[in-house]
UniProtKB/Swiss-Prot annotation:
Source organism: Escherichia coli (strain K12)
PROSITE patterns in the cross-refs: RECOMBINASES_1, RECOMBINASES_2, RECOMBINASES_3
Residues making up the signal peptide according to the UniProt record: none
Pfam families: HTH_7 (PF02796), Resolvase (PF00239)
Protein name as it appears in the record: Serine recombinase PinE
GO BP: any one term: DNA recombination
Record-annotated Resolvase/invertase-type recombinase catalytic domain positions: 1-134
DNA-binding region: 161-180
Gene name of this polypeptide: pinE
Amino acid sequence: MLIGYVRVSTNDQNTDLQRNALNCAGCELIFEDKISGTKSERPGLKKLLRTLSAGDTLVVWKLDRLGRSMRHLVVLVEELRERGINFRSLTDSIDTSTPMGRFFFHVMGALAEMERELIVERTKAGLETARAQGRIGGRRPKLTPEQWAQAGRLIAAGTPRQKVAIIYDVGVSTLYKRFPAGDK
């Protein structure tokens, strides 16, 4: 059975173009979402995935209607393949029921993995460069060294940690980490 999926990013957008293309392709059922593709909560897609069974073909108008990213799309199509479900994208001329379509998706999977590895590589290189220039990653410290010293003096003088935490707007656990209980 051919089962279609349409998605638009906002409620005021229209799915007619996608629906017409899927109807012309012979889809018997069409599921719909009116939500951004970056959102992981897509009720129409979830319902569609529960409905699909071995031998079915999931049909979309265009690849970007289904996946949030290339990596997400490749993972999703691989999960479908494991369940015996084919995938077809009308405008991209992809059909995983054919050897060429399956090959194309293997290539896409390799490209998605390479993209992920390149991002990791660039991130590491950027962090190394920043460290070499004396910059430290992460957020700025909540307190200056002088404020930490003052907080330590207050605790040493017997001020309850809860009160010091309120004064410096830090958690009590943060104070215990910085000034363990036995270190008064």
